[in-house]
Amino acid sequence: MPAVSKGDGMRGLAVFISDIRNCKSKEAEIKRINKELANIRSKFKGDKALDGYSKKKYVCKLLFIFLLGHDIDFGHMEAVNLLSSNRYTEKQIGYLFISVLVNSNSELIRLINNAIKNDLASRNPTFMGLALHCIANVGSREMAEAFAGEIPKILVAGDTMDSVKQSAALCLLRLHRASPDLVPVGDWTSRVVHLLNDQHLGVVTAATSLITTLAQKNPEEFKTSVSLAVSRLSRIVTSASTDLQDYTYYFVPAPWLSVKLLRLLQCYPPPEDPAVRGRLTECLEAILNKAQEPPKSKKVQHSNAKNAVLFEAISLVTHHDSEPNLLVRACNQLGQFLQHRETNLRYLALESMCTLASSEFSHEAVKTHIETVINALKTERDVSVRQRAVDLLYAMCDRSNAQQIVAEMLSYLETADYSIREEIVLKVAILAEKYAVDYTWYVDTILNLIRIAGDYVSEEVWYRVIQIVINRDDVQGYAAKTVFEALQAPACHENLVKVGGYILGEFGNLIAGDPRSSPLTQFHLLHSKFHLCSVPTRALLLSTYIKFVNLFPEVKGTIQDVLRSDSQLKNADVELQQRAVEYLRLSTVASTDILATVLEEMPPFPERESSILAKLKKKKGPSTVTDLEEAKRERSADVNGGPEPALASTSAVSTPSPSADLLGLGAAPPVPAGPPPSSGGLLVDVFSDSPSAAAPLAPGSEDNFARFVCKNNGVLFENQLLQIGLKSEFRQNLGRMFIFYGNKTSTQFLNFTPTLICSDDLQANLSLQTKPVDPTVDGGAQVQQAVNIECVSDFTEAPVLNIQFRYGGTFQNVSVKLPITLNKFFQPTEMASQDFFQRWKQLSNPQQEVQSIFKAKHPMDTEVTKAKIIGFGSALLEEVDPNPANFVGAGIIHTRTAQIGCLLRLEPNLQAQMYRLTLRTSRETVSQRLCELLSEQF
């Protein structure tokens, strides 16, 4: 920047500012400002021409007055005239005034644009920098229309100075954020990608920010940036390289650039090129290794820079979700931060582990830190850290730890910050329902929830507990007994009265045989709460009373007296008065048979998606992550409508889920002839009659298919137009899969038609039913499709998902294999060593055993192997095999027609880098298929 000359001090401006500061009152300040404004007007309108210095001084005074909060309605032309000056300070003040005071509707905008164009064309780097800063500061649509085509040329020009390139990149980024439709993507894109190799730190950092933003909207145009970003990142983090070593910040080389490069890589799936992928893995391993090294400085700047790179690397590992070893290492590293003395680090570790808990590969590793997280919930002083601890407990919850986590959440709820109580209530309700093996525990949990935090229990929660009690015969008597006992407390929350009134009205007869809960006692107990409740609750209790008339004829007279009282028949509330009159008349004139018909027990509710999860998402607020990304990061989307509780030994599912049950499978397996129940209308069969019309499988489809053998959620397919994400869950022979179709472009997809294609053999063995989707998918939007699945018999093939649509007048046709494999219906079974080997010997016929010896395709890591076997669906049996290095598993394949017991044994040979896998089942085809699927994972 040019040196400021002696005359640029502007003493008059300093005196004016001093006068303003010395004013004793608001009136004195306004008087001084008006005096100065009159002086400036006279100077601007005078016959004597002002020199550049005077214009600059007076424009600065006007700018200062404006910043004090006073309107300025003159001086704009003088500021524009300063833009034509060849003196840096005068031009600088002109641009400053324009950036702050001139709006896009000004009559001077054309003159301003001409001055900016002249400076951009001047090739004077200082003037070009001022012009670019002004464009970015104003950032209006008009500025984008005028200069969006010029700035890319400056950015990629070979003779542009580094400082100007940096400003041009940031200016273009600002315009793209303000008006993305006006920034053209053209020939310059390939050249701007190569700025990632620039040796100037400012240029490459600004270019990375620009490319990251552009790649989110136009991934195909910038896909070459992946290899360049990996290469540059490798040169930075590898100690042998000297790239940007001059930009080391507290012993961390170029930390800001490293973070931006890692963020850029999160715009894309894992690299397909093995060399690039291997190099990226080396980079991530190097970053994780450096995190384990002793700190090179005790200063906070060193740890901040080092941890910033580490956390962004962990975000990339989680985003790719394809390297089990890295995921487990990342989890272990974060576990060390959970007890760090720095609060911010503990917060970030908890937040990152929430995401890692959604991966099949790292979920078990996250669960090992449960005691530390529970301790954080109890001892952390910062409420935001405690909230993250709640989120992590919710994310790591599965059947093995659900009761412990729910108990801890309930304990914390009594002292929780009021701002997060409703969210915790919703999470407890979701977890209690999803992982309820014993539904008496579920009832106890919800009633305890109402007792502790009744004011925060929404209607969705107590509606849901009533639905589940009505749908489950085995819990109705217990629920009636429990609510009766709870209502005997001197002070009951109104929500408990609602639940108690409804349940006793339906099932009070189940406990009426006990003298302590006789019909009259039940009525008096409920009526003692009547006058303390709001109108809606009183209306519900009146309905309970008329139900009692049907259930217990002996209390009919007592209830009629209550309904006949003036407080009811002449109630000021119309609803209560109408109910009292109608119920009284009904109890008087209706015969016993009619009364029994009108007031019969409520039928089971249709199984449908619970609204509790939707309530939780609404409570959490809008997310910056797209639903398709959530498909990768979350485990499930809806709440179970009350499935049959499984035996404790076989209740664990292969894919733990912190969110909610996707399966609305009902209280019994669906009737084979009919479709599964649904809240969204009739289901339609989408088996294609013309599979020949489908496109060949998309590149990488087989690899993505193999990745989903041991996982249920993630991104199945992605190209420049379309992203397909999956969320799925299976229980016994039933499953439900949600497919998310995301439009990555800004243009509508028309005639959007997804079709499932199955061979004749597969159709006979696998039942698939789905709902149609909207044929129009807006740009940047996503649509969801649910697929209900039933395994009729064992199968070997997988269905193909074919998507056809029109994009920009062009017909698009994409086919991918849908990862529905036999092991999805694999339920784990715990067995003692003696039982295992006894069963192993029983399955000794040659046709019952399949064995495969194969070379390891991935690093032979014990923890990763365990995670894959559990993800495959088998129980991992500890201390069964005499050789502790071997892995032994057991489970049952559930189909509609049969249940097939399965035993497996995996023997690793570390020296030879080989595995021997043995499968024994009662059916040869099952042994063969499971062996094929599992051997591909190692």
From Swiss-Prot:
Region annotation Disordered: where it falls in the sequence: 616-677
BP terms from Gene Ontology: clathrin coat assembly; clathrin-dependent endocytosis; intracellular protein transport; synaptic vesicle endocytosis
GO CC annotation, single: AP-2 adaptor complex
Physiological role: Component of the adaptor protein complex 2 (AP-2). Adaptor protein complexes function in protein transport via transport vesicles in different membrane traffic pathways. Adaptor protein complexes are vesicle coat components and appear to be involved in cargo selection and vesicle formation. AP-2 is involved in clathrin-dependent endocytosis in which cargo proteins are incorporated into vesicles surrounded by clathrin (clathrin-coated vesicles, CCVs) which are destined for fusion with the early endosome.
Localization: Cell membrane; Membrane, Coated pit
Keyword Cell membrane set for record: yes
Protein name stated in the entry: AP-2 complex subunit alpha-2
Subunit structure: Adaptor protein complex 2 (AP-2) is a heterotetramer composed of two large adaptins (alpha-type subunit AP2A1 or AP2A2 and beta-type subunit AP2B1), a medium adaptin (mu-type subunit AP2M1) and a small adaptin (sigma-type subunit AP2S1). Binds clathrin. Binds EPN1, EPS15, AMPH, SNAP91 and BIN1. Interacts with HIP1. Interacts with DGKD. Interacts with DENND1A, DENND1B and DENND1C. Interacts with FCHO1. Interacts with ATAT1; this interaction is required for efficient alpha-tubulin acetylation by ATAT1. Interacts with KIAA1107.
Residues that bind a 1,2-diacyl-sn-glycero-3-phospho-(1D-myo-inositol-3,4,5-trisphosphate): 11-12, 43, 53, 57-61
Keywords on record: Cell membrane, Coated pit, Endocytosis, Lipid-binding, Membrane, Protein transport, Transport
Matching InterPro entries: Adaptor_Complx_Large_Subunit (IPR050840), AP2_complex_asu (IPR017104), ARM-like (IPR011989), ARM-type_fold (IPR016024), Clathrin/coatomer_adapt-like_N (IPR002553), Clathrin_a-adaptin_app_sub_C (IPR003164), Clathrin_a/b/g-adaptin_app_Ig (IPR008152), Clathrin_app_Ig-like_sf (IPR013041)
Protein family membership: Belongs to the adaptor complexes large subunit family.
Membrane topology: Peripheral membrane protein
Compositional bias annotation for Low complexity: 645-668
Gene Ontology molecular function terms on file: clathrin adaptor activity; disordered domain specific binding; lipid binding; protein kinase binding
Paired cysteines (S-S): none
Gene3D superfamilies, alphabetized: 2.60.40.1230, Leucine-rich Repeat Variant, TATA-Binding Protein
Primary location group: membrane
